[in-house]
């Protein structure tokens, strides 16, 4: 079982079909990261409404300072306000994030819906391009 499926099965209320849908989308992340010159990250809500990173890809087309793999890590809404607002209001949001001291990145968040119109994840693009 791959990591995304394992994390979602253990920590979320997503259905098997929703998890498989997210898994298929995550397979495109390396390509999406390269053509968007962005780090691409997928967040889902866990059972207690914290956020979990379930997929991530860094671009090969632009330089990003080293940041450890965050897959499986959890965050509270206060730690990821743009992600949380995207979950709450189901709208695309643009903002900034401090990647390291003094280094701001542009951040774009998008809600991701399943075939029934239910929001299942947020995809975030972070770029310094």
What are these regions (language model features)?
Residues 1-2, 7-18, 122-129:
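Juxtadomain coupling helices with adjacent low-complexity linkers
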Residues 1, 18-19, 49-54:
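Short, functional N-terminal and low-complexity linear motifs
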Residues 76-129:
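Sensory/regulatory domains in signal-transduction proteins
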Residues 17, 70-72, 97:
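A generic structural signal for short
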Residues 4-7, 11-14, 22, 65-68, ...:
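Generic, low-specificity signal for short hydrophobic/alpha-helical stretches with a mild N-terminal bias
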Residues 19-33:
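Short amphipathic alpha-helical segments
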Residues 29-92:
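Structured interaction and signal-relay segments at domain junctions
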